[in-house]
């Protein structure tokens, strides 16, 4: 019995760690939004790192609020093919101080039938006003 339990648990852990979003239905696409804090790099190779502060940030697709960054990072959502606008807005309890994460950001994507697109949206910390 313990051997069976151990095998079941290891299978569950492997499935959780190596997760890939399911393929979209025919004629549709799947978009996964990966929210991160932009800490440097170049436009071609941004250095974008996970930040737990972004978990509650709202994700808007084509102007409609569609959940939070935490909701979108695993399986994303099924969308129609074509061009879409992604916006990520951080909830503010108070004004941002210099260096605090993050300023709202966005991205444009074009989805194709059968595609699973993982789109990174990098949000910057508030810069100094110098």
Which residue stretches match the model-derived regions?
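Sec-dependent bacterial lipoprotein signal peptides
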Residues: 1-15
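Short loop/turn and low-complexity linker motifs enriched in small/turn-promoting residues
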Residues: 17-130
């Amino acid at each position: 019995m313990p051997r069976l339990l151990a095998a079941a648990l290891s299978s569950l852990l492997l499935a959780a760690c190596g997760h890939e979003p399911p393929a979209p239905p025919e004629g549709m696409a799947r978009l996964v939004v990966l929210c991160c804090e932009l800490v440097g790099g170049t436009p071609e190779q941004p250095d974008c790192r996970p930040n737990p502060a972004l978990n509650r940030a709202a994700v808007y697709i084509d102007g409609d609020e569609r959940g939070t960054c935490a909701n979108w990072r695993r399986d994303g959502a099924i969308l129609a093919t074509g061009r879409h606008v992604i916006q990520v807005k951080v909830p503010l309890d108070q004004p941002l101080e210099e260096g605090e994460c993050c300023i709202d950001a966005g991205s444009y994507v074009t989805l194709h039938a059968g595609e699973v697109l993982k789109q990174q949206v990098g949000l910057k910390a508030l810069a100094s006003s110098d």
